[in-house]
Amino acid sequence: TSFFGMKTTTERITKERVFGILSFIIDNQPFELNVYQGESAGEEDVDTNYLFLPFLDESNGLTTYGGGRYIDLYVPVGDTLIIDFNQAYNPFCAYNDKYSCPIVPRENYIPLNVTAGVKSFKNY
């Protein structure tokens, strides 16, 4: 699969490719999300097996960061990969807009409220 330019919250563009399509079921509803691998995978200090799963859901902007959340995954040995939404985290730009964060592709939208993982925070 060829690499494409994924937009970020700044002018920077990351080079990603769709590594695979993750198919799963939540509450008897089937869903699919693209999982990505960066062009830098395998370079110095970058794990060759690292995969990037950005997603949007109904909680964004309400109880979670409006721009979506990410889950870090790794290339599986077989053809099964476990998605643990408890591992969902906010991108760095949720905390400081000076960071450059990949914008979650619209096709990675889940039309339900994912209550697991990191939530929004309040400034104190």
What is the predicted function of each stretch?
Residues 30, 39, 59-61, 77, ...:
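Residues that cap or initiate secondary-structure elements
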Residues 29-33, 69, 81, 110-112:
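Short beta-strand segments
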Residues 49-51, 79-81, 97, 108:
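A short pocket-lining beta-strand/turn micro-motif at the edge of beta-sheets
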Residues 40-48, 73-81, 122:
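Short, surface-exposed linear segments at secondary-structure transitions and domain or protein termini
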Residues 25-27, 34-36, 56, 74-76, ...:
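A structural detector for beta-sheet-dominated domains
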Residues 88-124:
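Extended, aromatic/histidine-rich regions of cofactor-dependent oxidoreductases associated
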Residues 52-89:
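Acidic, glycine-rich flexible loop segments
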Residues 3-66:
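Mid-length scaffold segments of soluble, non-membrane domains
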